[in-house]
Amino acid sequence: MEGNGTENPCSRTLGWLHQNNDAKPWLWKFSGCFSLPEQTLPLSSQTKEYMENKKAAVELKDIPSPLHVGSKFFPAVPLPDIHSLQQPKVQLSAIPKVSCCAHCPNEPSTSPMPFGGGSGSSGRSGSLIHTGSLLDSPSTGTVTCQVGSDFAFQSVSSLQNASARNNLVGLASDLPSMCVDSNLPSCKHLSCCGKFHFQSCRSNVHKLHQFQTLQGCTSAGYFPCSDFPSEAPGHLEEHLSHSELTPHLCTNSLHLNVAPPVCLKGSLYCEDCLNKPARNSIIDAAKIWPNIPPPSTQPAPRAVPLCNRCGTKGMEKETSLLATSLGKAASKFGSPEVAVTGQVLETLPPIGVFWDIENCSVPSGRSATTVVQRIREKFFRGHREAEFICVCDISKENKEVIQELNNCQVTVAHINATAKNAADDKLRQSLRRFANTHTAPATVVLVSTDVNFALELSDLRHRHGFHIILVHKNQASEALLHHANQLIRFEEFISDLPPRLPLKIPCHTLLYVYNLPANKDGKSISNRLRRLSDNCGGKVLSITGCSAILRFINQDSAERAQKRMENEDVFGNRIIVSFTPKHRECFEAKSSNAVVDKAKSPKKVKNTKLCLIKDTGEQSPSAKAMPGKGLQANSGSATKNTNFKGLQELCRMEPKSGNRIRDHQQGHGSLATLPNSGPTASVPTLKNTGVRETLHRSSQKKENLSSQSIASSPAQKKKREGTVFQISYPSAFSQLIASRQVSPLFSSQSWSPRSMSPNLLNTASPLAFNIANPSSAADCSDPFANGVDIQVSNVDYRLSRKELQQLLQEAFSKHGQVKSVELSPHTDYQLKAIVQMRNLHDAICAVNSLHRYKIGSKKILVSLSTGAANKSLSLLSTETMSILQDAPACCLPLFKFIDIYEKKYGHKLNVSDLYKLTDMIAIREQGNGRLVCLLPSNQARQSPLGSSQSHDGSSTNCSPVLFEELEYHESVCKQHCSNKDFSELVFDPDSYKVPFVVLSLKVFAPQVHSLLQTHEGTVPLLSFPDCYAAEFGDLEITQDRDKGVPLEHFITCIPGVNIATAQNGVKVVKWIHNKPPPPNTDPWLLRSKSPVRNPQLIQFSREVIDLLKNQPSCILPISNFIPLYHHHFGKQCRVSDYGYSKLIELLEAVPHVLQILGMGSKRLLTLTHRAQVKRFTQDLLKLLKSQASKQVIVSDFSQAYHWCFSKDWDVTEYGVCDLIDIISEIPDTTICLSQQDDDMVICIRKRERTQDEIERTKQFSKDVVDLLRHQPHFRMPFNKFIPSYHHHFGRQCKLAYYGFTKLLELLEAIPEILQVLECGEEKILTLTEVERFKALAAQFVKLLRSQKGNCLMMTDLFTEYAKTFGYTFRLQDYDVSSVSALTQKLCHVVKVADMESGKQIQLITRKSLRPLTVQLLVVLMSWEGDAYLPVDELKRHYETTHSTPLNPCEYGFMTLTELLKSLPSLVEVFMNDKAEECVKLTSLYLFAKNVRSLLHTYHYQQIFLHEFAMAYTKYVGETLQPKTYGYSSVEELLGAIPQVVWIKGHGHKRIVVLKNDMKNRLSSFDLSPVNHEDQPAVSRQILEVPEPHLASELHLRTGPSQMEQELLQLANSSPVDLLCAPVPSCLPSPQLRPDPVILQPTDLIQFEEHPQEPLGVLFLNQEEKTEIPIPVKKGNLSCNSSPSSPASASAPPKPSSEAPGLLISKDAVESPAKKQPKNRVKLAANFSFAPVTKL
């Protein structure tokens, strides 16, 4: 059959009842099944996918006669009236024949069984075969058979004889794998319909979707609905849920009272079959069959029906089956065909579906099959499907979606996604073809929202007269919607889609290659085989001798490879390829290699399965075993309404099935295979029951789990080898169940999981393990039998509990039945819910659909709970063992065990589960209660973590109650107790008083360890003072409780020592680990660790600390706890809210913060030493931070403490008697201790932060402002900062990034932004007052801008504020009492105007900040003084220069500093040493300052861009590096200062032009500092540009007697010759040019009035001061004393209006590339100075 069709990927060959003559006794091939290979039934070429052929109707003339095929298939079977079977192929109008009728004989001895031989769509009923003849049929070849039987049982009436029924049942059990596919790929029918549809598979029967059959036709592989023997129906019912028992029809005419048959589509039915009701219930026909009007066509003439078996003629009267009589029989896939009297009605109007799946896509993880089904069910009523096409790029679309569409017979057209509108063009083409092919009336369904289809829809509707149905999304265009007759929203159409299940799970298949050359090396052969099998995905596993094993990903690939490789040449040898090994050694090698491969790649094993063939050993001729195989999990798109069944359901089903199997085997000597009971896995055949023998053998041979066999019981010694299966689970939930259900499979055999071999516990894959004994599996309970718990977190706590429960109930009820909804109490804003659903399938659907579903204002997080209800016994045994191993004598009272268990693991314990652990624990009755004891075989500790040798923790250390190792302990020490007559019966616990001591912990600690050493590690607390007195003298016990520390608490302050409670209630002082701690152990490792608790207990522990720290000495009587709690917190302490019934239980639940002292009713409550140390550390850090020097001397500690906390210092408040005792407990990473003048100094340990960390902290301060501005009232709890920061910015707040180790330290590093307020234990973060007003101003601007006219009535302020920002406005947050006072503080933002209707708040009109920015830049760039300028000085210079006051409020800022801080890219604001606010230019604008000065030396203040770099280098004295400023080129750098320059032009003609606003030159006298001596040095500090040292100075002296002539005087202060010295930058160039005649307007009157005034000043000095005797009378004479260094180069002042032509511009002296106007400073030859550039 391999050439006739393809098989299912999970199929495999089956062994048959007769073996080949040349086969080994242990090997079974698939030979002998049929007579001749050429007589096999021809297969379709497309049997892999049952829906690949879209044609709904098939000509019967193309199909061979069913009886003819049956006769060819089984020639040895004698048939009556054989002449009636030899007839030509039937035509469409011919009457098909009924299989048999009541007139046919039924002999009990040779009960014939109707065997489906073909497709029911052609009206065939199958052939009749006898059991004996079938078994005796010879075979000559190997035939691959497919799973899914087409056989049918006879009716009960014809099987009255018991033997006949037994024979039939045995044959039915032995032949589960016989199936012959027909040539019709669309649907395959049997003569008699039934309930189970079996997919083609090789060894296992997989239940697929129960297809709703056509009228009178049933899908292939269905059992008869009513004709099961007495045992078979019940056997099959065990594996079906009630929902899967759908109504069905039967076509069998084997009833005794034969009525006229009724024909539908070529099949004949008797009245009994039609009138018989369904097995379970009658379904309303109106709900089953679509309401399609009956066609008006006339049925074709019919002949008299004739029985296919005996030739008896029936009646001529025929009855047509209509919708009202048969019920719904529409196909799930493909077009609903309405067939009456064998003819397909072609008169129905056509319908075409055109789906733009890229526009209206299938939701992620949802089933495309359901979408197609809904389209067909909604629109195809009364129509015939003519077209169903979707267009997409299949390489971009989900492969599973494409596969589902192919399975649904949808045409998937591929287009290139990169081409523009390719999908739309293809769909428009399909629409036009549809219009050309079909005529009205016709219907077009377009699934798209694209407006491009509007033209086509309009044409189809108005020109062709088609009915247009548009399935669109919400955002569809009106132009598109206008052209449709019917509109349907796509969102509603795809609502509640079920999740898409995986189509198939790949299974690895092995292929064996023989006849390989022996003289070649393995690598060459491997390469050759790999080349032959590469196209099929083969992998060479091993090469042994002349054979090799190849692995393929599925069966199809292996079959293709077999065809390609068969008889191929491999180095001169013709190889033979087979699915079965030839020798036993080959099989063993294959199994070992498979195990190795799985061990190497466990991840691959999780997703795939290896189909292994297991050796069956020698067996008797009467009992032949078929090769075993791993379970095949198959869940495809056709699966619907199936329940997820885990391993436990399979285990529960196995005992009944196994017993029936064994009965059939013993009665008939055949092997039975069970039909699958679930969509995910099959039930394997289990014949062996010896679990202990299996485990014993596995421990001896160390066999791997996947290849070991299970021994049989003594009654079945001859059937020694069985089948061991691997079970693979399709989902992670099932894997979770499986991993926890291994142990219960063996619990009933009294087998301890501790004795399991390591190979069993640590296999390569957690999914593979043995199912040992079916009978033992009967005790396994379904973990989800009582419902499935779903945990819902991130629930909106602002909603009421009732509203939340209702919303959750409504949301989850859409996905299945909800059993209960439970909410956790409101505590610490951590509200969670537990929703219990009916089954696992509904729970999985709910988790997939509702995860991150928004309820209220939050998106809930949904996950499947794995709580106590789903815990397996194996996990319970581990937890029980860990508790009992740490208990005294490995025993605990039952009530104490339950208490510890529930507190340790956080969930309830079912006591009945403990009785199931009979192999591990024993529960004994003792006295008035029960005792839980660990069996001796399990008392050894599992790991050193729980052993007495461990010093890093103990399980008892984390449990609320600590027990002594003995069940009973003496109340007092008999040796040292002063009261020799002490008796427990007489002792009254209420009379005990807790002693208070005054001791040093350094002295007391070694004494206690010594005392425990002499008392063998335990000292009763009652006699501790007596024992201590006997060893070291009397204790210093004080009667004043306010001056001492409780002895019981003081003992627990010693590292490694604790006080435990024995089971008789006696408190005992003991070592934590029952031995002295090592000398070098960290004390913190010896403290009790915080147990993992729920949020309620964490909140309660904080409240306990806050309550007790306000009590004297942190001690509180237990009787006063409730009233003080109520008084302190203003609420009741409800113990039930925390899950407890008694207060003492609640107090014991927080042992890491609360210690209970004493006994009886006079017990005292205090904080543990660990909590006290933590509390003292916080107080100490607060005290140190309050000091200016961040340190304090121990002698001044009391005074500093009083100043900081406003109360006297008392060391007993922290549970110790000496300060040094508790300081020594603080880690060195927190504080630093140093010695200073015989006194100890305590200081905070800090490290210097880098400059990068400081810059990051500045950025962090901006983030904090942004975060808190989004919080109500600009404040938030401290503990919410980190999650809020992460949520707001989408990144983690890493403290090390800013140079801190604690968040509080980081927040305290920005005191100008943030304040940390403490309200008891809770810390609140809020903005400072300045930042609050800034934030409020921004809110007011937003609020007023949203109002009409940018104004708001004052009376409406609070209402509009709450409406806009979601919380009320509080005046007290801003320290004001009225809105008017508030507006005065916000005068830079709002103003109050008196209107007729009242006072109105108006938004002021701000001035533009851009002109002011330019003006401030000019002032700063013209400043010739220090590198920075005080803010006040800047304001004064601005007002002096522009003669206008500078009011920041006009620009929307309260102060000038805030205004400058809003320009971070231009200036920097900082505090100098004098605590003055100063401002300076940024490094980028210092560069801009130099550019401005450079351009001022050029004519028209512009320069070519390509000359700029060289000119700048000459001018400044250093090379221009744009990368220094963070830019890659000069052009980008200049573009970063748009306020100063701009670039115009193109190409090489681009020029750099100074902005007009920057051309103004301010007076140097106004901006220069008074002291000019230090200016050059300071100027060099600004830009740090080294200036060349000039050895000579050139002075221009002008005096009263020298006014008419100019004298150049050279003053040489260096011995070096002037010519050898560097040329000064201001020295005139030797190039001489005549002055151009330039007429300039001059004031001649002013010129004649002062003829002898100096007209210019020339500076030739760079470093030393210049002598400038200038009489300043009228006007401002430029005194540019700054050198032309890059740091201080500034523009000369603007010429005075009185004498514009008298002043020398700097251009005339320093311009390097332009002709100068006529200079007022003349030399002898009347030549002007040439351009001079700086060196």
From Swiss-Prot:
A Gene Ontology molecular function term of the record: CCR4-NOT complex binding
Compositional bias annotation for Low complexity: 1681-1700
Residue span(s) of domain NYN: 351-488
Keyword tags: Differentiation, Meiosis, Oogenesis, Peroxisome, Phosphoprotein, Repeat, RNA-binding
InterPro entries listed in its UniProt record: LOTUS-like (IPR041966), Marf1 (IPR024768), MARF1_LOTUS (IPR045602), MARF1_RRM1 (IPR034189), MARF1_RRM2 (IPR034191), Nucleotide-bd_a/b_plait_sf (IPR012677), NYN (IPR021139), OST-HTH/LOTUS_dom (IPR025605)
Sequence ranges assigned to domain RRM in this UniProt record: 788-867
Spans annotated as Disordered: 617-639, 657-720, 1671-1718
Gene Ontology cellular component list: cytoplasm; peroxisome
Domain spans labelled HTH OST-type: 872-946, 1000-1076, 1096-1170, 1172-1248, 1256-1331, 1332-1407, 1408-1482, 1483-1557
Comp. bias regions, Basic and acidic residues: 657-666, 693-704
SMART domains in UniProt: RRM
Residue numbers carrying Phosphoserine: 65, 757, 1088, 1090, 1568
Keyword Cell wall biogenesis/degradation in annotation: no
Biological process annotations from GO: double-strand break repair; female meiotic nuclear division; oogenesis; regulation of gene expression
Compositional bias per record (Polar residues), positions renumbered to this chain: 673-688, 705-715
Annotated localization: Peroxisome
Role description: Essential regulator of oogenesis required for female meiotic progression to repress transposable elements and preventing their mobilization, which is essential for the germline integrity. Probably acts via some RNA metabolic process, equivalent to the piRNA system in males, which mediates the repression of transposable elements during meiosis by forming complexes composed of RNAs and governs the methylation and subsequent repression of transposons. Also required to protect from DNA double-strand breaks.
Subunit structure and binding partners: Interacts with LIMK2.
Protein name, entry field: Meiosis regulator and mRNA stability factor 1
Species of origin: Rattus norvegicus
